[in-house]
């Protein structure tokens, strides 16, 4: 058995009647980033959802610290953050309110100063109280990125985190990833952008 905190063995995923991948093995250790690559429809998002415990594989298992995540979901979810394609914001709530809800759903106390600092860090100072429906796609994505700053967990699973971001936003994501890895964090991600992140970065191609 691998000593890596995250270990997947013999994963098989089927969508409809189509086999996306089978016999897939991977590990992820502190300070490592794994970029999942492949053509559209290759199963990148499906793999990330399996690794995040949001979908079950047809075969195989995912273990976190030696325990099957499907049988220990609650403890796994306290150590992992998943960011999907959509920012996951409530349209009628402001960035500030959305982040308060996000922190509360994670079972943590909302620290107003930390939320304010996170919004400033991602360039949303002055937009704290604007309903999400009035934000641009890039501003919504920046709001979602605040969750990485507010929830200090070891594992990030990010599906296309650069979506809708401008050059500064992309640079910010890279900066966050580099800091996370340098401090012993781990990351799994998909992206159509060149990664260009300093650290122990690897790739897995599903095509």
UniProtKB/Swiss-Prot annotation:
Transmembrane segments: none annotated. Signal peptide: none annotated. Its EC number is 7.6.2.5. Residues 6-207 form the ABC transporter domain. GO terms for biological process: cytochrome complex assembly. ATP binds at residues 38-45. It is a peripheral membrane protein. It catalyses: heme b(in) + ATP + H2O = heme b(out) + ADP + phosphate + H(+). The keyword Membrane applies. InterPro entries: AAA+_ATPase (IPR003593), ABC_transporter-like_ATP-bd (IPR003439), ABC_transptr_haem_export_CcmA (IPR005895), P-loop_NTPase (IPR027417). GO terms for cellular component: plasma membrane. It is found in: Cell inner membrane. GO terms for molecular function: ABC-type heme transporter activity; ATP binding; ATP hydrolysis activity. Its main location: membrane. Keywords: ATP-binding, Cell inner membrane, Cell membrane, Cytochrome c-type biogenesis, Membrane, Nucleotide-binding, Translocase, Transport. Belongs to the ABC transporter superfamily. CcmA exporter (TC 3.A.1.107) family. The complex is composed of two ATP-binding proteins (CcmA) and two transmembrane proteins (CcmB). Part of the ABC transporter complex CcmAB involved in the biogenesis of c-type cytochromes; once thought to export heme, this seems not to be the case, but its exact role is uncertain. Responsible for energy coupling to the transport system. This is Cytochrome c biogenesis ATP-binding export protein CcmA.
């Amino acid at each position: 058995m691998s000593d890596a905190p995250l270990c997947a063995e013999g994963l098989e995923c089927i969508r409809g009647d189509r086999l996306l991948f089978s016999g897939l093995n991977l590990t992820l250790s502190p300070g490592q980033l794994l970029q999942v690559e492949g053509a559209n429809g290759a199963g990148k998002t499906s793999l990330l959802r399996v690794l995040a415990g949001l979908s079950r594989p047809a075969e195989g298992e995912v273990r976190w610290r030696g325990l099957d995540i499907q049988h220990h979901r609650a403890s796994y979810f306290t150590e992992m953050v998943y960011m999907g394609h959509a920012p996951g914001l409530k349209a009628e709530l402001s960035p500030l309110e959305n982040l308060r809800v996000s922190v509360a759903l994670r079972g943590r106390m909302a620290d107003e100063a930390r939320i304010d600092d996170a919004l400033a860090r991602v360039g949303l100072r002055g937009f704290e109280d604007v309903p999400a429906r009035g934000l641009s796609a890039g501003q919504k994505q920046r709001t979602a990125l605040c969750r990485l700053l507010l929830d200090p967990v070891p594992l990030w699973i990010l599906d296309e985190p650069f979506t809708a971001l401008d050059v500064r936003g992309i640079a910010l994501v890279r900066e966050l990833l580099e800091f996370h890895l340098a401090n012993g964090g781990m990351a799994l991600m998909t992206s159509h952008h060149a990664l260009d992140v300093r650290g122990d970065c690897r790739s897995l191609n599903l095509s």
